């Protein structure tokens, strides 16, 4: 026996699922590559976390609710895997529309919107199936799919048409292995909000091919000016929709990890396919999301709570002013063309590399900018949009102004002579 043991060799390898788990944003933010200029303070406008600079914070009312419930010790145990009934009821009232009424049974509470996305993809697709996702788009869709050995097909967003979906390209990608269309509105990274008519056009494609829609609507409450958000589920009574939402962006608490899947089951299509039972089963894998945060949802999401509504309106106006500053300042930079944002907390900036002596692409632009000016951005290649970069404009005005002045100086330094 001892001889047999001595002849064996250790061979412990990472699983195929783990090897497929590649999130380019986290890889860049967590590990970096380029080093900032040690003589300048680093200004990071790279990650969609509104809490980084401390200028945007959840209202005290929400903190007080949470503290009160912590002290009560009523929510220290395991919640139901799909969420507390009171939390699900609150979400149902919050996301339902006059044409799409919901009850607590139509809500699955998840660990953040990313957890909700994982549930939605996991319940609709099997290994070898394919899902259609936007390009440019949020890399997590592909990362989540690949860990489940689900193939990803990217449908184009048309830059010259305000990043609307290329409907003909979308149609061309559909085959017998296509099981869902994922639509992100308002959009990360583009910062655009789709019109009602364009959403109806997308829904028509889904109806033609009998494909359910996963609607990532996490930024639904962050729209600017006259740009109105339309929940996709409010625009159809034929196409079944899994709508993704959460409190991370509206309430500035991404670390609280609270999201949801809202099930809009048209003609019992999901029920007949046991989709609801499947979501419940998948939710049981993590034994339910944060119990304490769930406990405050009835008051936090109450549509009649004017205190919360006024605070949310103030935050949105603040972000809108930051977006305007971004466009106003960076429009003056040599070789840069900002894309006007109609919502979210993101701005895409187009780079004309022909204007520079020694910058070939967005990767080089972002890398050299960090090394010389200590301003950290994400290159568009991360989102499948080369020769752009994304700015997160949540920082205080003084920090944004300083960062943009450095970017303008950088563009002048590298200007083609």
From Swiss-Prot:
Query: Which SUPFAM superfamilies does the record cross-reference, listed alphabetically?
Result: PLP-dependent transferases
Q: Which residues carry this modification: N6-(pyridoxal phosphate)lysine?
A: 249
Question: In Gene Ontology terms, what is one molecular function of this protein?
Answer: pyridoxal phosphate binding
CDD domains named in the record:
AAT_like
Q: Which residues form a coiled coil?
A: none
Record key words, sorted: Aminotransferase, Phenylalanine catabolism, Pyridoxal phosphate, Transferase, Tyrosine catabolism
Q: Which residues form the signal peptide?
A: none
Q: In which pathway does it act?
A: Amino-acid degradation; L-phenylalanine degradation; acetoacetate and fumarate from L-phenylalanine: step 2/6
Q: Which GO terms describe its biological process?
A: biosynthetic process; glutamate metabolic process; L-phenylalanine catabolic process; tyrosine catabolic process
Q: Which reaction does it catalyse?
A: L-tyrosine + 2-oxoglutarate = 3-(4-hydroxyphenyl)pyruvate + L-glutamate
This protein's cofactor list reads: pyridoxal 5'-phosphate
Q: Which Pfam families match?
A: Aminotran_1_2
EC numbers for this chain: 2.6.1.5
- Reading the lineage from the top rank, the first entry is Eukaryota
Instruction: Please state which protein family the record places this protein in.
Output: Belongs to the class-I pyridoxal-phosphate-dependent aminotransferase family.
Record-linked PANTHER family: TYROSINE AMINOTRANSFERASE
Function in brief: Transaminase involved in tyrosine breakdown. Converts tyrosine to p-hydroxyphenylpyruvate. Has much lower affinity and transaminase activity towards phenylalanine.
- Share what the entry says about its subunit structure, partners included: Homodimer.
Q: What is this protein called?
A: Tyrosine aminotransferase
Record the organism: Dictyostelium discoideum (Social amoeba)
């Amino acid at each position: 026996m001892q001889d047999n043991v001595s002849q064996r060799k250790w061979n412990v390898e990472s699983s195929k699922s783990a090897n497929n788990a590649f999130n380019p944003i986290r890889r860049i933010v967590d590990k970096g590559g380029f080093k900032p200029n040690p003589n300048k303070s680093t200004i990071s406008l790279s990650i969609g976390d509104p809490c980084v600079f401390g200028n945007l914070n959840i209202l005290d009312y929400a903190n007080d609710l949470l503290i009160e419930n912590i002290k009560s010790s009523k929510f220290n145990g395991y919640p139901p895997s799909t969420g507390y009934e009171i939390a699900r009821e609150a979400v149902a009232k919050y996301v339902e529309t006059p044409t799409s009424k919901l009850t607590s049974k139509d809500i699955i509470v998840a660990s953040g919107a990313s957890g909700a996305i994982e549930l939605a993809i996991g319940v609709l697709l099997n290994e070898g199936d394919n899902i259609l996702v936007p390009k440019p788009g949020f890399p997590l869709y592909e990362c989540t799919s690949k860990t489940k050995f689900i193939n990803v097909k990217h449908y184009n967003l048309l830059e010259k048409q305000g990043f609307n979906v290329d409907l003909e390209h979308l149609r061309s990608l559909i085959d017998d292995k296509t099981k869902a269309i994922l639509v992100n509105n308002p959009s990360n990274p583009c910062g655009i909000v789709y019109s009602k008519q364009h959403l109806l056009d997308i829904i028509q494609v889904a109806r033609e091919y009998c494909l359910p829609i996963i609607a990532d609507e996490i930024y639904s409450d962050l729209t600017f000016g006259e740009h109105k958000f339309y929940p996709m589920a409010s625009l159809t009574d034929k196409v079944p929709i899994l709508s993704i939402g959460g409190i991370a962006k509206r309430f500035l608490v991404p670390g609280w990890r609270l999201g949801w899947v809202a099930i809009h089951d048209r003609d019992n299509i999901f029920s007949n396919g046991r989709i609801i039972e499947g979501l419940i089963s998948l939710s049981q894998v993590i034994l339910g999301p944060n119990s304490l945060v769930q406990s405050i949802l009835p008051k936090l999401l109450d549509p009649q709570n004017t205190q919360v509504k006024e605070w949310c309106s103030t935050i949105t106006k603040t972000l809108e002013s930051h977006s305007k500053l971004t466009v106003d300042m960076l429009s003056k930079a040599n070789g840069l063309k900002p894309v006007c944002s109609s919502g979210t907390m993101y701005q895409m900036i187009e780079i004309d590399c022909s204007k520079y002596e020694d910058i070939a692409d967005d990767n080089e632009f972002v890398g050299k900018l960090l090394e010389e000016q200590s301003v950290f951005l994400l290159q568009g290649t991360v989102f499948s949009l080369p020769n752009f970069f994304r700015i997160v404009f949540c920082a205080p005005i003084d920090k944004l102004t300083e960062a943009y002045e450095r970017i303008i100086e950088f563009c002048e330094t590298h200007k083609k002579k």
